[in-house]
Curated annotation (Swiss-Prot):
This is tRNA-cytidine(32) 2-sulfurtransferase. Its EC number is 2.8.1.-. Its cofactor is Mg(2+); [4Fe-4S] cluster. HAMAP family: TtcA.
Length: 274
């Protein structure tokens, strides 16, 4: 690729800086780590790999990177694209082959959302493979907008106040998931992917399901952002500034024991009759 324009250079620096800040803030990568980068062939995971390869060069610690793609046997999946790209980069990689596509198509009725089952099958396979190769961290390409969308999806449809944490220990206790792009917005990632000309692989299984709940929430957030620029960032910051005493979860705050503090100074003010 040729010389970057001023704007492209600013964008690249911004993404690298924000990813570096997220990695540092949540202690995502430590000295000696083996980071398994989950590469789907989409803009987010390509950007993730690109940013982490740069971080590997400049970080004051040593860590390994291994790229892993899961071939789910979707019809028309271009098997040659990722190996060719990764060989050119000189990155160690593995292609994990597992026919989850057939499982999903068999179990999910036509027209119904496949994302949930597909995600669970993929996640379980990748967790197992990470354990097999001795990966200490599993890096995913979720960004700030994904996190905010998930927050609203859980609120609207599951009645829970949760999102995607930048760092997570899996339920099995053997895998730590990290999201280095947690501070990066999707618009920047899309622009970066465009000028870097990553060889994007479309998802034939879930990418065409335009009526997904996530897409509805995404459109809602985009509309809010158009009307009030900066709102998405403000919502994301709120996830880092939680005040349990101002919510209603009795497991997080002991409301039942709240009593008047008899030692507190009185607020009464002497009133002078006029």
């Amino acid at each position: 690729m040729g010389t970057l324009t001023v704007n492209q250079n600013k964008l690249q620096k911004r993404l690298r800086r924000l990813a570096g800040e997220a990695v540092a803030d949540f202690n995502m990568i430590e000295d000696g780590d083996k980071v398994m980068v989950c590469l789907s062939g989409g803009k987010d995971s390509y950007t993730l790999l690109d940013v982490l390869l740069h971080l590997q060069k400049v970080a004051p610690i040593q860590f390994e990177i291994v790229a892993v793609n899961m071939d789910q046997k979707q019809p028309g999946f271009p098997e040659y694209v990722l190996p060719a790209y990764l060989k050119e980069l000189g990155v160690e990689y593995h292609i994990v082959e597992k026919d989850t596509y057939s499982v999903v198509k068999e179990l999910i009725p036509e027209g119904k959302t496949t994302c949930s089952l597909c995600s669970r099958l993929r996640r379980g396979t990748l967790y197992t493979f990470a354990d097999e190769i001795g990966a200490t961290k599993m890096a995913l390409g979720h960004h700030r907008d994904d996190i905010v969308e998930t927050f609203f999806l859980n609120m609207f449809f599951n009645g829970s106040l949760k999102a995607m944490p930048p760092k997570l220990r899996a339920d099995d206790g053997r895998n730590v998931v990290i999201r280095p792009l947690a501070y990066c917005n999707e618009k920047d990632i899309q622009a970066y992917s465009d000028f870097k000309q990553f060889p994007i692989i479309p998802c034939n299984l879930c990418g065409s399901q335009e009526n997904l709940q996530r897409q509805v929430v995404k459109e809602m957030l985009l509309d809010w952002e158009r009307k009030t620029p900066g709102r998405t960032e403000s919502i994301f910051r709120s996830l880092q500034n939680v005040i349990p005493s101002q919510l209603a979860d009795r497991n997080l705050f002991d409301f039942a024991s709240l009593k008047i503090d008899e030692t507190a100074a009185s607020r009464f003010v002497n009133v002078v009759n006029l």
